[in-house]
A protein has these predicted regions:
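Bacterial N-terminal signal peptides
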Residues: 21-32
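Boundary at the C-terminal end of the N-terminal hydrophobic targeting segment
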Residues: 35-37
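CBM-like carbohydrate-recognition segments
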Residues: 39-86, 95-107, 111-114, 118, ...
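Extended ligand-binding clefts on enzyme/binding-domain cores
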Residues: 178-179, 189-284, 290-301, 313-347, ...
Length: 380
């Protein structure tokens, strides 16, 4: 009897030790997390029925899998994978991973397999920012799977982009269009995230600070081009998203971080002043009478979510704006998960009416992509 009692005591002691060890481990992990990562802002919880980021993200990712490769809305297959599809595919992959949906992730990766075989003609020649950015997708798949063929394909695009740099160390693809502040940045960041090689990070940071010096206006916003004095929504959206992605990966002690952070906060402050009462930004940011545009709204919302979650922005102010942006954005979502009010592809033109008269598309991937970025950012 004494032996049984002694055995029971030892069993209980061992159980207590295991529980205590588990609690200690959990506590240490929580301490290792940034404070802002331990508690979601209340604005990022308790979503109205059908509006939560996991629900919306899954719908939009599934929609990508339903459609053929995009050709900028033109009939027939594209000559190569286009940059709006790259942005959407990247967002879908990050969403699938962050939401823990292994089946969705597997199907998104499977969608890529023909590109190594019968669809190899769709691999863009990496000789222009809009084509080079393709590499971000195989690099994301490599980050998730560690399969070498994805690294080789994606890294080739990143390396080609700096094959013949300028005397200042910039990519020869530099052209000072604000779109580049996402296109160049995300490719080089993905190469850094995949390899850990800081040369890719330094390239992205140099490129971004050079663009900031040249293009950011005193109010924190960006003209579509230096000779086109209009704050076109999606153009600025690419910048906002690019800075948010840059700051996610840039170490605190990086010499270019302070400048990028200052420019980012300056832009966010200005955007806050121009957000519509419905949560949606306008086709021309500072023209409240211009039409509500959804791709820019998604991009600005992504940048604000990322800033709040990482503690770069005042939580009380910007969490409210980000929630408002998300809920305003998804009111434009069709039952099949196509987004309405997406500005068509737009080249620069020094003509106000030109921007106001741009077509409003439904289901264009320029709009689908930032929904997935937002859903991913909420889950990080």
């Amino acid at each position: 009897m004494k032996e049984k009692i002694q055995g029971d005591k030892e069993l209980m002691i061992n159980r207590y030790r295991r529980v205590a060890g588990l609690l200690l481990t959990v506590g240490m992990l929580l301490l290792a997390l940034p404070l802002q990562a331990q508690k979601q802002p209340k604005e990022f919880t308790k979503w109205p029925t059908g509006s939560s980021p996991p629900e919306i993200g899954r719908r939009v990712a599934e929609r990508l899998l339903e459609i053929p490769h995009s050709n900028f809305g033109r009939p027939g297959p594209p000559p190569f994978i286009t940059y709006p599809e790259v942005a959407t595919w990247y967002g879908a992959l990050t969403f699938a991973q962050l939401s823990g949906d292994k089946d969705l992730d597997a199907r998104l990766i499977k969608r890529f397999q023909p590109i190594f075989a019968e669809e190899s003609n769709l691999i863009p020649v990496p000789d222009h920012v809009d084509r080079s950015v393709f590499g971000a997708v195989p690099l994301e798949i490599y980050i998730q799977t560690k399969e070498q063929k994805y690294l080789d394909l994606g890294k080739n695009s990143a390396d080609k982009q700096w094959e013949d740099p300028t005397p200042d160390g910039l990519s020869s693809q530099t052209r000072y269009w604000i779109d580049d502040m996402y296109m160049i940045i995300i490719l080089q960041l993905q190469a850094y995230r995949a390899t850990g090689d800081s040369k890719y990070l330094d390239r992205a940071a140099l490129e971004m600070t050079t663009y900031l010096d040249k293009l950011q206006q005193p109010n924190g916003l960006f003209y579509h081009a230096p000779d086109v004095p209009f704050y076109w929504g999606r153009g600025d959206g690419w910048v906002a998203a690019g800075m948010a992605e840059m700051l996610r990966s840039l170490p605190e002690n990086h010499p270019r971080r302070a400048q990028i952070m200052e420019s980012y906060r300056k832009m966010m402050k200005s955007l806050l002043q121009h957000q519509g009462k419905d949560g949606v930004w306008r086709q021309l940011i500072d023209h409240p009478d211009s039409w509500p545009e959804t791709s820019s709204t998604g991009m600005f919302t992504f940048a604000m979510i990322t800033g709040v979650k990482n503690g770069w922005l005042d939580k009380k102010t910007y969490a409210k704006a980000a929630r408002k942006g998300w809920l305003g954005l998804i009111t434009y979502l069709e039952p099949n998960a196509d987004l309405r009010n997406v500005c068509q592809g737009t080249g620069k033109k020094n003509d106000l009416q030109y921007y106001l008269d741009r077509q409003r598309l439904t289901g264009d991937l320029h709009g689908q992509a930032p929904i997935l970025w937002c859903a991913s950012a909420f889950l990080r």
